[in-house]
Amino acid sequence: MKKRMGIVAAVATAMLCSSFAFAAPIKIGLMAPITGAFASEGQDMQKICELMTEELNKAGGINGNKVQLVIEDDGSTPRSAATAASRLVAADVCAAIGTYGSAVTEASQDIYDEAGIVQIGTGSTSIRLTAKGMKRFFRTCPRDDEQGRVAQSTLAKFGFKKIAI
């Protein structure tokens, strides 16, 4: 459910792309681990985004413009991520969603930022990612330090004294 909400937020954010009058479809990039260590997550992201794109287009698109989902496989590696990000920039997407894994996301951040493209990470928790201060980078999950703080607070609230991971 959390993953789906993140994807919903990402697609909604991509509506920023619709502030201009487009004759062509609005291109939204999905950079996801279709292969590699996180393939199951990436394949789920792909299915969700394809379904949402279909539903958006059936409802008339965004401001009357059809949405085109452009998919690139980041292979779950930073090197592949840089290539995938460059391909999405070349495809002229207005936003890139779905980057999963902090190292993969970080490898693509500068590429998207320099191109002026909004990037929405859906499974990237490293503090470094937002510490850079990139104005077009967003994420749908909490940072590592926030997860620890909330976990500690929740465990204390329920009176747990010892935990095991």
Regions found by a protein language model. Give the residues of each.
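Signal peptide-proximal N-terminal region
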Residues: 46-69
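Sec/Tat signal peptide C-region and signal peptidase I cleavage site
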Residues: 17-23
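Cleavable N-terminal signal peptides
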Residues: 10-11, 21
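Extracytoplasmic ligand/sensor domains, especially the bilobed periplasmic-binding protein
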Residues: 90-165
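Bacterial N-terminal signal peptides that target proteins for export
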Residues: 1-9
